């Protein structure tokens, strides 16, 4: 009887110790669950929770309904939540270096290999007190989408006169300084209603996700070439990261690196499927050509770099990493 009781105590103690040893990481995501990018992040969560059984688990608390999308980066810095999946552009004021990802023509796989992501991680830790775990869903760029047929001038350049163009922090510098557009800043969650009411009639958006958001109900034209890159990343409160066991950190980092590659490949296929569906439903593609296309792309890149350099110069750390970031994130 004594032996049985002692064995039971040992078993209970072992179970309690194991339960205590399992790390839990709380997380939120910037966009609604219906969006393809959120689905990608939730796939990453599932992969971690499978690989991390008994070691580390991610507990998703929700999306913008739990913490506002623009408040999420500050929430992870403050430790209100441990992990956030969000565009770097949502915390551009704290880290202008995120523009290296926005203007990049490389993928996470390439910049992981050449040291670019390691540098971005170092900058995140220094400036924001967060660990930059991974750049997910890279390799997808942006298009300008319009309700009405776009106007081109005599040189084939896009004329945005009269467009009610929805803007945001990702592409405002390009839209205002090169295109000369007057933008109306709106969060993603308000764009459908704005299109429906005619508040805006054009927007920048990534190559995929238009169908998920149902904006294709109002937008009829896609303008090529595409520009920029998605800058969707997963950041973790640095104090929380350092408190995790070494095994937990290894699992999280290894799964993140694998998901960088897997998500990039998967979303490339989704893009092709979305384009086919949209064009089958009647969407028309307007392509800038020759010098007009080159000027359009060059302006998108240079205006973003200029913005990054100017904001970096204003920070205490200065713009010493500017040239290195361009070298690592842009192939000329």
Task: Describe the residue ranges of each PLM region.
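Cleavable N-terminal signal peptides
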Residues: 8-9, 19
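Bacterial N-terminal signal peptides that target proteins for export
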Residues: 1-6
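A gly/proline- and charged-residue-enriched helix-loop-helix capping module
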Residues: 107-127
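Sec/Tat signal peptide C-region and signal peptidase I cleavage site
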Residues: 15-21
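N-terminal secretory/targeting leader peptides
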Residues: 11, 22-110, 130-332
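Sec-dependent, cleavable N-terminal signal peptides
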Residues: 7, 13-14
